[in-house]
Amino acid sequence: MKLDYPKIALIGVPTDIGAGHRGASMGPEALRVAGIADALRSRGLEVQDYGNLQGPVNPWQPPVNGYRHLPEVVEWNRLTMDAVYDSLNRGELPVVLGGDHCLGIGSITAVARYCNENGKKLRVLWLDAHADFNTSEVTPSGNI
């Protein structure tokens, strides 16, 4: 029995706006250079790479009221939410190539919205180096 998988939509989100150190913004290109699209295709999956989203630059400022770069984080996540939601509406499986951990705000919001509108159960696979459970009251860094 052959399974029918949706097209994979690679969405690059090259930002380190929610991180305390530079480098996460290189993630999408590093994954592409490492051959993520070819690795998926070699497993029989159809892949569409939509390139990178373009968002605000990182001002590298200290936290304000417990949050670092809140307006920029909001904008990157609005862009991410729109791209992921559009991908789901095209019947694709979005794979967000980040970027830093704050992108869960936009990507998971898009999936939750899509699932709610279509009577589907929300499922998220999150791959990260560590758990990111901070609030403005407990974060030592101000990272969102």
Regions found by a protein language model. Name each.
Residues 2-144:
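Conserved alpha-helical scaffold segments that buttress catalytic/binding sites
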